[in-house]
Amino acid sequence: MNSTKVVNVIIAIFLPPVAVFLARGWGVECIVDLLLTIFFFFPGMLYALYIVLTS
C-alpha cells in the first residue's frame, strides 16, 4: 500500500464521499456514497473503503 492509498483510506473513514470522489471522480459511485452517508454513515464508510481499496 502506498502513502496515497493510506491517506485515501483515512479520508474514507472520516469523509466517505470525498474519498470516493478522489478515487473515481464525480459519478454514480460518488452519488451513491453521498446518499449512503447522509442516511446511514456506517454503510457509506464501508462503501467508500471498498471503492478506495479496489481502485
Curated annotation (Swiss-Prot):
Topology in the lipid bilayer is annotated as: Multi-pass membrane protein
What is one cellular component GO term in this UniProt entry?
A: plasma membrane
Q: Name one GO molecular function term.
A: phosphatidylinositol-3,5-bisphosphate binding
Say if the entry is tagged with keyword Kinase: no
Q: Which residues cross the membrane?
A: 6-26, 34-54
Question: Which PROSITE patterns is this protein grouped with?
Answer: UPF0057 (PS01309)
Q: What are the GO BP annotations of this UniProt entry?
A: monoatomic cation transport; regulation of membrane potential
- Alphabetically list the UniProt keywords: Cell membrane, Membrane, Transmembrane, Transmembrane helix
Annotated InterPro entries:
PMP3
What does the record list as coiled-coil region(s)? none
Subcellular localization: Cell membrane
Say which domain of life the source belongs to: Eukaryota
Pfam families (UniProt xref):
Pmp3 (PF01679)
Protein family: Belongs to the UPF0057 (PMP3) family.
Function text: Plays a role in the regulation of membrane potential. Could mediate a proton leak.
The name this protein carries in UniProt is Plasma membrane proteolipid 3
Taxonomic source organism: Eremothecium gossypii (strain ATCC 10895 / CBS 109.51 / FGSC 9923 / NRRL Y-1056)
Source organism phylogeny: Eukaryota, Fungi, Dikarya, Ascomycota, Saccharomycotina
